[in-house]
């Protein structure tokens, strides 16, 4: 097992945007022993800073830490989608996992729909691992670890955080607590819905244009919040141009933390600071200065930007 000094050395190495050579397996093994003890609805205390999609935009993650404060000084909650699309998925996910192992009570990392074997084989993480390591071992270590990530989090029993959205199969938090999460993300069903669904202007449940999950209306979100004694659903999963977007009569907020998404969308990013008294403050930020782009052929399909 790596010591704290080993982890500090690894984190310092990763902060320079350098992949770890051979220590990834040990790091993932240690992270698994931590994550297996966490819940499907992981309780989180305030103050905490809530973050949306990162998608391999490593230098923008460093900018996020510059704006929001470094770990462990700031307590962080990340709502998934650490990999794919950006050029530095390996460095991004390795840094977040190393921070989790080093400061387990100061960072919560949830599962997004991209923390999946199938999706990462299409949208970049698998190919990046092959390019940077010469084989798929690191990809396998991380995708095996992804099965253990909590699905949702609950800040002070009031703010419900997850990657995607609600499910017609899940009326209560106890329904979510009863799921068996330690598996590849299924193509359908409640676990899939939590990672894939989106809020919609239309009431009720709808068919998702993504081909997985559902759309859910303001009536659904309001009922879920009322049933479970919640003040807010905080989620990520969708590009919003200002970095955050209130919807569904303020029952739902979307947070997106990858500025200039895919290096071309022109959006701002945001994070949400939840204070000691549950007060809410959004911090917006622009992309970090562009680095020299790696020589990568961009063949990944857009699916949903």
From Swiss-Prot:
MF term (GO), any: metal ion binding
Claim: ATP-binding is one of the keywords in the record: no
Family in the record: Belongs to the PPP phosphatase family. PP-2A subfamily.
Manner of cofactor binding, per the entry note: Binds 2 manganese ions per subunit.
UniProt entry tagged with the keyword Manganese: yes
Lineage: superkingdom: Eukaryota
Cofactor(s) needed for function: Mn(2+)
Uppermost EC category: hydrolase
TM ranges: none
Biological classification of the source: Eukaryota, Viridiplantae, Streptophyta, Embryophyta, Tracheophyta
PANTHER family: SERINE/THREONINE-PROTEIN PHOSPHATASE PP2A-RELATED
CDD domains: MPP_PP2A_PP4_PP6
Pfam families: Metallophos
Name of the protein described by the UniProt record: Serine/threonine-protein phosphatase PP2A catalytic subunit
Active site: 114 (proton donor)
Binding site for Mn(2+) 2: 81, 113, 163, 237
InterPro entries: Calcineurin-like_PHP_ApaH, Metallo-depent_PP-like, PPA2-like, Ser/Thr-sp_prot-phosphatase
